[in-house]
Regions:
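Non-catalytic structural scaffold of enzyme domains
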Residues: 1-192
Length: 192
């Protein structure tokens, strides 16, 4: 069986990284329209947009929090130092969520953070070839404990663009895919 899905796919949502207030208003209006269309539970498949979840929650429907569900899944395996591949806004959300679970977020810094953002925006332009994949694998390795890395014991794909460049087989550590976690949580919530 498949669950019924009502979707508002809006590529005109303002950038969640640079125009957060505007994004929250648009996301809130989208959530209200989904409620009118018959939605009974809401989910937002953008990690960074969870910083604007208050606007979505104003619709008054249950909201599946992608960041919280992913943090739960990541610590379930026992890791306590978890590398987060996410935008700066997503990093803040994951650092707080992991801290609430007694785990530490290991984050990209400096040139690696800039390289990550370049890869994310590249995916949005359709750049998903071998060079982009190698770039994401290098960043994952930078977070890993081997080879002088940052010491992560597991990884979170905390941006939905990440799995388009790095899958679990190519990751140097166990990888929790936030999009997969959200999809599973949606199915579970709707099958109740």
């Amino acid at each position: 069986d498949h669950i019924r899905v009502v979707m508002d796919l809006n590529p005109q949502v303002p950038d969640r990284n640079t125009r957060a207030g505007e994004a929250e208003a648009v996301l809130g209006a989208m959530a209200a329209r989904l409620k009118v269309a018959g939605a009974q539970v809401l989910a937002m498949p953008c990690n960074t947009a969870h910083a604007q979840a208050a606007g979505i929650r104003e619709a008054g429907l249950p909201f599946i929090d992608m960041v919280e569900a992913t943090a739960d899944a990541a610590v379930r395996g026992g890791a306590r130092r978890i590398g987060v591949l996410a935008t700066p806004g997503g990093e803040r959300l994951y650092a707080a969520a992991l801290d609430r679970r007694g785990a530490e977020a290991v984050l990209l810094t400096g040139a690696d953070r800039a390289a990550f953002m370049a890869l994310v925006y590249g995916v949005k332009r359709g750049e998903v070839g071998a060079e982009a994949r190698a770039g994401m694998a290098r960043l994952a390795q930078a977070l890993a404990g081997a080879g002088g890395g940052a010491g992560a014991e597991a990884l979170i794909a905390g941006c939905t663009e990440v799995p388009l460049l790095l899958d679990a087989e190519a990751a140097p550590l166990p990888l929790t895919d936030s999009a997969e976690v959200l999809a599973q949580a949606c199915v579970e919530a709707c099958r109740g």
